[in-house]
């Protein structure tokens, strides 16, 4: 099957799951505007996780092109990162990721067909891994190893990773004055 989803904003990611997400067959395009973007934890086919380096507006086209495929998606909401996978992707092959430009065909729920893409900006030409290939800054939350960004919580005075260090009592962040 085909799944195309864009987050609705407010910091939410397009994908959200409890402990694991196995990707096995089908087409997936999941675009996230916030910093909660998650990747498939166990892809059984090549998958791409890309950060655009900026927030793309709704209506922007995103293209994934290789020798054996040409997928174009139209964002239905803002996005700063996206996850893409399809059975046509192969480890070791090159995928060119572009955004912007125009598309001459139809767009049904974000998936474009029956036309051609032109005039976009090339974001990257990536050699695909057999599992997940990541590119760019994607703004993920820390903690879960399957989330984009893979940041860690800072260690604070209490040492539990949840309490930041520093004095916040003078009207700065969380000061309340």
Question: What does each model-found stretch correspond to?
Answer:
Residues 1-177:
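A composition-driven surface/loop motif
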């Amino acid at each position: 099957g085909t799944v195309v989803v864009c987050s609705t904003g407010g910091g939410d990611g397009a994908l959200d799951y409890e402990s694991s997400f196995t990707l096995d067959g089908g087409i997936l395009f999941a675009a996230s505007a916030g910093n909660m973007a998650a990747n498939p934890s166990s892809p059984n086919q090549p998958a791409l996780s890309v950060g655009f380096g900026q927030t793309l507006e709704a209506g922007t086209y995103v293209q994934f092109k290789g020798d054996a495929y040409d997928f174009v998606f139209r964002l239905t909401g803002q996005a700063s990162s996206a996850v893409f996978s399809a059975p046509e992707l192969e480890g070791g092959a090159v995928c060119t990721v572009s955004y912007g430009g125009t598309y001459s065909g139809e767009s049904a729920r974000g998936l474009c067909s029956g036309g051609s893409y032109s005039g976009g900006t090339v974001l990257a030409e990536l050699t695909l891994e057999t599992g997940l290939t990541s590119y760019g800054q994607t703004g993920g939350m820390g903690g879960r190893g399957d989330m984009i960004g893979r940041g860690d919580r800072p260690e604070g005075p209490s040492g539990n990773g949840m309490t930041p260090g520093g004095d916040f009592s003078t009207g700065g962040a969380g000061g309340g004055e």
